[in-house]
């Protein structure tokens, strides 16, 4: 229906006023005379030239080739006009011959490009018949020449990707906006570029690959080897995931521990990613391919960094030093905590505490620390072996090593976490009690049914006991609040350190290194758009422009191709965090995805 | 054919408007901003180094001086590459689109191209900027969903900030080409 070879078809948008744009590949600018082959886009009044067919040719064979290409690529390839690259003296016979071709391959409008050899002056003419009969007078359109680098346009990908139409029979609807249609045409016509000048085909073409099809031995070998390697890796990974899902790890204490450790989370994430990469399905589209490549490069870099870390640790027997330093450090931390508690039990910062409560709380926490120190001393002979075995896991990747570090920090500061929970629970109990008794003091009550504060008439003895309790609680508030404040600050410190480690792990997990490398080395592959440059212009000659690819900025590359990660983001805003701190609710600022609310 | 005029921007600095007419359907306007002056570079460098020397006499640490030199160099390079715009160009090609290029002092160029199918109109708009009312030229983009709506307003010559006389000239030329484009696109 939209076949461009019908002489009765007139484009509705391109009247005589609209300038005709001819997209011409730079590789064909020095080719010999011949026919122009490409696609005509009537909505934008543009002709995308894909190749030049040289003399001598047999018209029937040219038509056959074009039909084959049209079948294979779903692009409406047709003969658009003639190309003449001649010497200084115009050859009259050639001129008539070229015009005669117009009747053979009828196309509206018929393009005639002409260039003098060795000079930069071009001549363009586009003729269009104004009636159904061949004898009707022809009218000429203004032509604008736009040069484009065929190889770069073929390989590049526009962002944001225009909604590419599905492959339909016949000419694809150019619902893609103006320039996206050009990119789309060149990308789909790859089958036209398969033959080079060393082939013995019936038709001689010039296009970007006509000097010889490019290929790399390494890439071809890698492609051949990739199949069996992927199969082997996929089997191994399925074995590992089956082993991890087996019954041994199901019972409750173990599954609870696995869910809390960030190392397991990271290992699971890596396993998922690797399974995706080595799966046997082909990537559906360019986005999937980029994601696979990014994942692979990220995993390889991770392992390389991990091995580097391992070799550095082994070099000067650093494991032994670390193990030796670990127990004194834990001891030191416990000692500092004891000093802190002694300070709180006295008169901290000149404040006067309630002596009895102070002593109770202080002794309680001191006993905990005593237990903790004994536990650490119990473990100290085994520390070096444990550390050595954990260090081996660094060969699985730097992210795993960092996750193990974060887990070790959690385990070593477990007593701070316990103290924080005790302090917070005590404080929140006190605050709730205080608020309820304060309402009683004013003669009001919380209505659970209506979720609001209502007035209530209390008995005298209720009021008496309530006021007494209120007074007791309010006088004990500073002591509890101080303990709560101190332990919350310690807990926040530990959480900040862990958060930084997790941030680093997240960064390594989600950075799209392959895309960034591509943007650095082959910027034309990721295109944000195009840019034009006006070439030397002489009066009376057609306007010549050079179309270049405008590469995507680095920030957009990261944003578009960012890999999905474990999602370690702070779940609360600052306002809700402050509110929770004030009321003594427990906070878990860094939540992994899939954690249940406590 | 080419045309060059000397104008001023909203703060009184000198601008040069360079107009190139390639063909009835292709026009280019180039606005050159005032160059970076040696006086301001010298003033900033002297201030930073004096402050560093003052710190050095307090702390007796020679790292401060090397750090000051490093910071000055990096700051200058960063300023030339990311902040200081040398000239801004507007290229209008009938039936193709509008292209805006900013060239930085270090030679970096950042280009944006808007296809003609997305351009609704080019207008001069007023804005209140601190205590002044300024005029700026902007491109209105069509909304793909609503035929009479505007999806985005793209200002042109944002760092050169020329005055109304320059804007009127650019506006007239743009409107000529856009009118031609509209006539061509609506004719049967």
Swiss-Prot record, chain B:
Please give the pathway this protein is involved in: Glycolipid biosynthesis; glycosylphosphatidylinositol-anchor biosynthesis
Q: Which GO terms describe its cellular component?
A: glycosylphosphatidylinositol-N-acetylglucosaminyltransferase (GPI-GnT) complex
Q: What are the recorded Gene Ontology BP terms?
A: GPI anchor biosynthetic process
Keywords, A to Z, come to: Cytoplasm
Q: In which compartments does the protein localize?
A: Cytoplasm
Q: What is its main location?
A: cytoplasm
Q: Which Pfam families match?
A: PIG-H (PF10181)
Assembly, in brief, is: Component of the glycosylphosphatidylinositol-N-acetylglucosaminyltransferase (GPI-GnT) complex composed at least by PIGA, PIGC, PIGH, PIGP, PIGQ, PIGY and DPM2. Interacts with PIGQ.
What is this protein's function? Part of the glycosylphosphatidylinositol-N-acetylglucosaminyltransferase (GPI-GnT) complex that catalyzes the transfer of N-acetylglucosamine from UDP-N-acetylglucosamine to phosphatidylinositol and participates in the first step of GPI biosynthesis.
What family is reported?
Belongs to the PIGH family.
Q: What is this protein called?
A: Phosphatidylinositol N-acetylglucosaminyltransferase subunit H
> What organism is listed for this UniProt entry?
Bos taurus
